[in-house]
Amino acid sequence: MRALARSLDAAPRPVDVFFRDDDAGWEDARLLELIARFAEHGLPLDLAVIPAELNEGLAARLRDSHAGLHQHGYAHTNHQHEGRKCEFGPARDKAAQREDIARGRDRLREVLGDRLDPFFTPPWNRCTRDTAENLVDLGFRLLSREHKAEPFGLLPELPVHLDLARLTPEELDERFAGHVADGGPVGVMFHHGVMEPDDMARASELLALLATHASVRARKMRELCP
C-alpha cells in the first residue's frame, strides 16, 4: 500500500472514505468475519442486504451490530435474457420493478426496524431510469452504484470506486491512491461471499492503514447522504 500511503501523506485535507459490503444474506460466516475485522479496526461498514435471503437469525445479529444497513435489490436474481446480469434492468417493466423494490423494503423494515437506512444498491450495480423513478416515488434517499455509471439526476447518488474482489493488491494500491488525489469521497466495495482467508488478510492490511492515517475520515453512508 505504498502508493496509497504516499497519496494520503500528500493530501491537503482529510479524505472521506466509506465501505460497502454487498450480498448480506449469503455466506453468513464470512459476513460476520468481515464485520469483526471492521470492528477490530474501529471502522464503519455499510451492508447491502438482500431482502429475500435475510433470515431471522442473521437479522438479529445485524440489528445488534454497528453496521449501516440498506436494501440490495430483492432476491439478487438475474432477469436479463442476454447481456450483463441485472435484477432491475430493461427486461422488466417499471411496475414489476416497483413491486419488488417495495416488497423488499417492507421485508427489511419488518425485521430490521429503524436500523434500516432508506438507501438502495442494485445487484450487480446496475439498474434503469425506471428503477430510480421508483426509488424516488417510494421514498428512498440514496442510490449507490459504481462510479462509472452515469447519474440519473433524480436522487442523490453515492458510488463506489474500488472493488476489492476484482483488483490485485497492486491495482488496488494505485487506483486507491488516484482517487485520494482526486479528493474523495472514495467508496470501497467488498463481497464477503467470495473472500478467502488471503482476501480477509489483505482487507485487514488495508483497514489498518486507513484506520490509523490522519488524512482518512472514515464515514458511514448516511453521513455522506445530502
Q: Where are the regions a protein language model picked out?
A:
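Acidic-and-aromatic substrate-binding clefts and catalytic sites of carbohydrate-active enzymes
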Residues: D23-A29, A48-A59, T121-D130, L164-E170, ...
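Active-site beta->alpha N-cap acidic-glycine motif
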Residues: M1-G68, D117, V188
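Surface-exposed, active-site-proximal loop segments in enzymatic domains
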Residues: Q80-A91
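Short glycine-enriched loops at secondary-structure junctions
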Residues: A24, G73-T77
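Catalytic domains of cell-wall/extracellular-matrix polysaccharide-remodeling enzymes
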Residues: R92-R166, M195-R202
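Generic structural signal for well-ordered alpha-helices
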Residues: A5, L31, I35, A59-L62, ...
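A conserved mid-domain beta-alpha-beta active-site/ligand-binding segment of alpha/beta enzyme cores
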Residues: L158-P185, M189-V194, D198
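C-terminal domain-boundary segment and adjacent tail
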Residues: R2-P12, L142-L143, H192-P226
